[in-house]
Amino acid sequence: MDKNWTTWNTQALQALDRGDIEQAERAFRQACVSGDPRADSNLGWFYFLMGGSVRDSEAEARYWIQKALQRSRHPRILQNIARLRFENGDFAGALAALQEAHQASQSPVLLYNLGVCHFGLGDKAAAAACFREADAANAADLLCAQCGAVHPRLAYAFCVQGEERTAALRRYAPERNDMELWDYVLLCVQCEAYAMAAPVLPELVSQWALTEQTLAMTALCLQHVPAEKERVLRCFSDELSEERDRLLHLLGDADECARLAASQPFFPPPATHEGYFTEECL
């Protein structure tokens, strides 16, 4: 092992912890002088995570991670290249990299991301199997709180149809977190479980952007559970009079309401894996 590389790598990660992005970039680049593919991968992952805050970050991320992959098929490098491919809409390429990584290293995050790729490719059966397995690993807290994903039960529910989707909704409902409220209401609407969504509508219209689809989902639920109408309308302040009027209009137009409620389909966000090689995994 190149001690010089590990030293620079540690300094880079410490700089990141301090929020010193420029020093982290310099140290990651210095680590790459060693020629170790893990150093190349770390630099690429740094650029990916920095996004537009660092000049030419997308091209740099692609260059360094691809360079690392040419010399190592380590599961972490494979997951890094998979995420780049996913962000570019190359679901097939991302899936291939994740499947190769999965042969060497299994984890709930990897399983979940396999499901996301299958979902993107339209293979809902394969996606459902992955989400079900990730859920069985009791990894929901890890996926949602640390990785930016959604509960695997929620993702699974959108992969199945009919009675199984309704059953999946009921299994998921007690586990719902606040960040998944919009998706939960969408799932309720698709399952025609309007009574399940009705109690959370005030929270929805108070905390989420009042897009056409949000208003349409709300109206659709209120059409079936009219007792909640006044409670929901009280959530609209004077500054939101236009949105309130739009909601009232949609309540009287069932066709437009149904069309708008289905305008943006659900798509599970990928889980952000641990992309850096740290001292613990060297």
Describe the role of every protein-language-model region.
Residues K3, G35-P37, M50, S72-R73, ...:
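Short helix-capping/linker turns of helical repeat alpha-solenoids
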Residues M1-W5, C144-C147, E180, R231-L282:
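Terminal, low-structured helical/coil segments at or just beyond the last alpha-helical repeat
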Residues L13, W45, L49-G52, R83, ...:
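Residue-level recognition of tetratricopeptide repeat
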Residues K3-S34, F48-G52, E180-D183, L187-C188:
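Alpha-helical segment of the N-proximal tetratricopeptide repeat
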Residues D17-A27, G51-K67, N88-E100, L121-E133, ...:
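Structural signature of tandem alpha-helical TPR/SEL1-like repeats
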Residues D2-L16, S41-W45, Q79-N80, Y112, ...:
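Alpha-helical tetratricopeptide repeat
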Residues R29-V33, Q66-Q70, Q99-Q103, R132-A136, ...:
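Conserved structural position within tetratricopeptide repeats
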Residues T6, R38-D40, R76-I77, V109, ...:
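Start-of-helix register in tetratricopeptide repeats
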